[in-house]
């Protein structure tokens, strides 16, 4: 079991590392490529577009051909794309490399969740996904620090050499450590109960959890996107204060994420999901009424705690009905989360909604919709029948 957890964690970490590690080198990258920092900030959107593109195909391929081939190819693409970014001499080539990095990271991300669905029951899966969420919260804190240390002695290209090395390590883990977990053919007596056709993506329970996780990701990405404006422009923080504040909020996320597995031993998953949405609602109300920086910071802290306590549980429930189509389900969740959050941020920008109101709106909207879905759509017998661990060791 340890090999699956190690490989899943490594596969997921490519996604946040690809976002956060290069940011510290952005001014030098812009200078060397004769582009403005504003022009290169589109690299974030390009990276997410690459992830979404990969997710369109990676899940189905993983269900048909196996998790291991997709993981190996994804890591290889990430590694080669990182090298392409390091060799870029102008902006368009750099953005092409960023898109391909997203493709590689997206494929690995989908496979990681499919592997966990294949190998863990619902209770253990919720705990592991909460831990995974805590680990991914470490990356936005550590990656810029590592990047800064690298750039003290080496040029910005070294950041992408480092990411390329990460791709190589993940590829080697996938090749030599990871075992195939894709479900084998079912016996004829099981086909009517568990078949790809029976595991529909349009069942009410999956759609409800897809909506909850998409709204939750929209909350956290809106927070990340709006935080520079809120903290430095509205609240008057310096860059140093901003970095410290974001590190502290990431610390809150880590503590809550690592505590959630223990909470799952005491409370039902539904209870933790309601607590999560209650924290979002409280954060929205707090931010709307805040008149001091201290109260605003308290509201922002509630956002991180709310996301960390509920997201892993909701993701685990969303994957539960899919013993044979975990790859497709994981892809669908990933695409909805990336596209849904991007759509909200884009619409809010087009409508001229301020950063604070953008955040308050998604917090209150997410909490109300999610609480209604949690109460109105509960796991039924059909979902329970598919909640099985299909993995069996292969020679």
Swiss-Prot record:
Keyword S-adenosyl-L-methionine tagged: no
Membrane topology category: Multi-pass membrane protein
Recorded superkingdom: Bacteria
Cellular component terms per the entry's GO annotation: plasma membrane
TM ranges: 4-24, 42-62, 69-89, 93-113, 131-151, 158-178, 217-237, 247-267, 271-291, 295-315, 328-350, 355-377
Entry-linked HAMAP family: MFS_MdtL
Protein name as annotated: Multidrug resistance protein MdtL
């Amino acid at each position: 079991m340890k090999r699956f957890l190690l490989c899943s964690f490594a596969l997921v970490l490519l996604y946040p590392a690809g976002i956060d590690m290069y940011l510290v080198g952005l001014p030098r990258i812009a200078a060397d490529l004769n582009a403005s920092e504003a022009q290169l900030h589109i690299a974030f959107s390009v990276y997410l577009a690459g992830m979404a593109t990969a997710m369109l195909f990676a899940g189905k391929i993983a269900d048909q051909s196996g998790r291991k081939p997709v993981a190996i190819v994804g890591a290889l693409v990430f590694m080669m794309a990182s090298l392409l970014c390091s060799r870029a001499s102008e902006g368009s080539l750099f953005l092409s490399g960023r898109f391909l990095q997203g493709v590689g990271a997206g494929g690995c991300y989908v496979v990681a969740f499919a592997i966990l669905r294949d190998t863990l029951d619902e209770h253990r899966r919720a705990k592991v996904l909460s831990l995974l969420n805590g680990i991914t919260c470490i990356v936005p804190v550590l990656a810029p620090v590592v990047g800064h240390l690298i750039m003290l002695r080496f040029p910005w290209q070294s950041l992408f050499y480092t990411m390329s090395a990460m791709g190589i390590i993940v590829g080697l883990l996938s090749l030599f450590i990871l075992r195939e977990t894709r479900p084998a053919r079912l016996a004829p007596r099981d086909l009517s109960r568990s078949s790809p056709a029976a595991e529909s993506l349009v069942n009410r329970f999956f759609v409800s959890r897809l909506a909850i996780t998409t709204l939750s990701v929209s909350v956290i990405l809106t927070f990340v996107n709006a935080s520079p404006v809120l903290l430095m422009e509205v609240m008057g923080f310096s860059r140093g204060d901003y970095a410290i504040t974001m590190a502290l909020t990431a610390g809150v996320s880590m503590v809550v994420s690592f505590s959630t597995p223990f909470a799952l031993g005491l409370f039902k998953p539904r209870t933790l999901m309601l607590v999560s949405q209650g924290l979002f609602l409280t954060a929205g109300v707090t931010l709307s009424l805040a008149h001091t920086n201290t109260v605003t910071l308290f509201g922002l802290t509630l956002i991180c705690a709310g996301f960390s306590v509920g997201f892993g549980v909701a993701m685990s429930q969303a994957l539960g009905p899919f013993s044979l189509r975990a790859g497709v389900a994981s892809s669908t969740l990933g695409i909805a989360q990336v596209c849904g959050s991007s759509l909200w941020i884009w619409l809010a920008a087009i409508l001229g909604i301020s950063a604070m109101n953008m955040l308050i709106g998604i917090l209150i909207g997410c909490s109300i919709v999610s609480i209604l879905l949690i109460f109105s759509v509960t796991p039924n017998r059909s979902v329970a029948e598919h909640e099985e661990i299909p993995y069996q060791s292969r020679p």
